[in-house]
Amino acid sequence: MTNQSTIDKLIKMRLTAMADAFRIQMDDPTMKEVPFEDRFGMLVDIEYSNRKNNRLKRLIRQAEFEQPDASIVAIDYQSGRKLNKALISRLTTCEYITEYRNIFITGATGSGKTYMACAFGMEACKHYYTVRYVRLPDLLLDLQAARDSGTFSTVLKKYPKPVVLIIDEWLLLKLTEAEARNLFELIHKRRKKSSTIFCSQFRESEWYQQICGGESTLADAIMDRISYDSYKIDIESIDPSKDLSMREVYGLDPAMAK
């Protein structure tokens, strides 16, 4: 069997990284001195790393992050915000995911909620968990359109699938009874099976009022399913008079900032 035949078969088996590495080995005279087991191990390592890198890229692309460049290591703890660094560091281990616990990120407009949520999402991708980012207004429209078209059950199935679901602009506007009912169905499907990151301008204590004015039993049902044992990150300003928007801190496009 010729070397080219071996390379062709590797390519047909979609082992392209291994094929490229094998070709390089064949062109390198010094490789003749390397034992077969070591050379073969090198080829396997290259193919393995390539596949993991491709998988990570695919997970990041499918997550549809609002801020795909967000990074935990780039979080600025000197930007005039009170941030619990110990808690943030703990959450980067992604243990909250295996515990099926949620994260609440609250703070004013421009405080960096979306950036932090996307950074947590990126860490989850690096641990090879599936992630999905969605704005609550878009989510509600999707669910209602599905309800109206008779495809609610089908559409509902796609939201429990991500291991981590990031819901941005959480309760920015008060929910109607119909919106709360649709949202309850989704949250119930995810309960104790996955983790959800909620980003809101309102503190948790104000969420009841944003769900049908706090008068519907759906408010209790939704809050009961998301608040128990959740991690809370409240991004507070140390000195509001000296505040910088996080879009300035991270150099983001103002049109993309939340």
List where the protein language model places each region.
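Short glycine-rich substrate-engagement loop in P-loop NTPases that contacts/grips substrate
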Residues: 81-89, 131-160
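N-terminal pre-Walker A segment at the start of P-loop NTPase domains
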Residues: 70-94
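Post-Walker A helix-loop "phosphate-sensing" segment adjacent to the P-loop in P-loop NTPases
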Residues: 121-134
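Loop/turn-to-beta-strand initiation segments
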Residues: 101, 128-130, 161-164, 191-198
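Walker A/P-loop nucleotide-binding motif
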Residues: 100-116
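Interdomain "pre-motor" coupling segment immediately N-terminal to P-loop NTPase/helicase cores
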Residues: 16-67
